[in-house]
Structures are given as structure tokens and as C-alpha cells.
Regions:
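STAS-like cytosolic regulatory interaction modules
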Residues: 1-65
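Short His-Asn-centered micro-motif
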Residues: 83, 95, 104-105, 118-120, ...
Length: 228
């Protein structure tokens, strides 16, 4: 128990390591560069130019940390960067959360890496309801968390301008391209790759967990095969 508590403290569980400026962030993050995990990074959701640039710097450093640990090939780096950028764009645009959270854990013996992104906002259902009330689109048929998660997985976008497919495309990249799995939950709706069902637990906002194996990297993988 003492070891677990020590680990949780090191990764800044449960509150996260606040990313407030690039200098402080890099000083705090430097001690993790040789570790098989990152701290729980806590990014302020603020759509100002400076904060977006800070977010993008953090994502680049985060991916570099993973790549350096497991010698990740450039085609996989591109895929992970696309997924993180797309999910963070969605969180910043729709979640109404004050913060977003990002962390990873490498499992060298299993040759797998897990990446987790979450927020504590209005959730996927709340995002559809907000868009429906604005009369930009009609999502009146989306009533439950399960309805919302199914719609998001199918690529039913809340964006005024269709740009990518968010969860839909990310899921396909991970499950078909990386041969891994993605678990995501919003409210009491839970999805693991193609399976979507009601969960006994309820979470505020959204959580995404990506499990990516790297023991048999597909050199032919290209993110462009999954973009429409």
C-alpha cells in the first residue's frame, strides 16, 4: 500500500500537475523523462492563442517522451498525434470543462502503452443537447448517454463545420490500424472498440483510454487510410 501511495503521489493523483506555463511545466516534467509513465498533466481549457500553443507544446513533448521510450516509428507517431489533437480539440470546443487531463503508462513486459485523456465537463450527451438547443442541428433523438455515445461513435458530429470524425476516426485508427483497443466512457455509457453498453458506474465528463501494442509494429500503417 505504501508503494502504491508513493506512486500515486509521484504522478500527482488525483489533482494532476497543473500546466500553467512552458518553463514551469518542462522543469517539473524533466524528472519523468526516463520513466515508463508520465504525471497526470492538468491543462487549463482556455481558447486563447497562448494557451492553445502551450497545449500543442505539451502534446508534442508527451509524444516525444513515448517515442523515446519505445522507439516509436514515425507513422505511429503521426497517428497518435492526430488522435490527441482531435480529442483535445473536441474537449476544448465542447466540454465546458475547466481542465483536461493527460497521462500515459508504458508496460515494457507486455509491449503495450496506455494513454488516458479525460475532462470533467458536460459529457457527450450534454454536448449534443447544447448543440440541439442552439438550433444549428437537430439532435432531439439523442436522449440518453447511450444514445449520445453511439452517435459520437458513428461520427454524428456536433460541429458546425464537419471536420474529421473525432471518436469515430480515432477508434478506427486504434482498433484497425494499431491493432489495439480504445475504451471510452461518458455518463453511464461505456464503449470498448465496437461494443457499447450501459455501465454500472457514472462519470462526469468523458474519459478515453487507448491501449496500443508495439511488439509487432505495422510498417504499412498510414493514418491517411483512415481519413475521409
Amino acid at each position: 500500500m505504501e508503494t502504491l501511495n508513493s506512486y500515486l503521489k509521484i504522478i500527482h493523483f488525483p489533482n494532476g500537475l497543473l500546466v500553467d506555463n512552458i518553463k514551469n511545466y518542462r522543469e517539473n516534467y524533466a524528472k519523468f523523462k526516463s520513466k515508463n509513465y508520465s504525471p497526470i498533466l492538468k491543462l487549463k481549457i482556455d481558447k486563447t492563442k497562448d494557451n492553445i500553443e502551450l497545449r500543442d507544446e505539451v502534446i508534442n513533448d508527451f509524444i516525444s517522451h513515448i517515442s523515446d521510450l519505445i522507439n516509436l516509428k514515425s507513422n505511429y507517431v503521426g497517428g497518435i498525434r492526430y488522435i490527441l489533437s482531435e480529442l483535445f480539440d473536441n474537449i476544448f470546443e465542447h466540454s465546458e470543462s475547466e481542465f483536461a487531463f493527460l497521462t500515459f503508462q508504458n508496460y515494457p513486459n507486455l509491449k503495450k502503452i496506455e494513454i488516458c485523456i479525460s475532462d470533467i465537463g458536460i459529457g457527450i450527451l450534454g454536448s449534443y443537447k447544447k448543440t440541439n438547443s442552439s438550433l444549428e442541428k437537430n439532435f432531439s433523438d439523442i436522449i440518453t448517454d447511450l444514445d449520445a455515445l453511439k452517435s459520437a461513435t458513428e461520427g454524428k458530429s456536433t460541429k458546425s463545420v464537419e471536420r474529421g470524425f473525432g471518436i469515430h476516426t480515432s477508434r478506427n485508427i486504434i482498433s484497425e490500424g494499431f491493432k489495439g483497443y480504445i475504451l471510452y466512457q461518458s455518463g453511464n455509457a461505456l464503449a470498448i472498440n465496437d461494443s457499447i453498453f450501459e455501465s454500472n458506474s457514472y462519470i462526469r465528463g468523458v474519459i478515453f483510454v487507448m491501449n496500443i501494442p508495439y511488439d509487432n509494429i505495422d510498417n504499412q500503417f498510414s493514418i491517411y487510410d483512415f481519413l475521409e
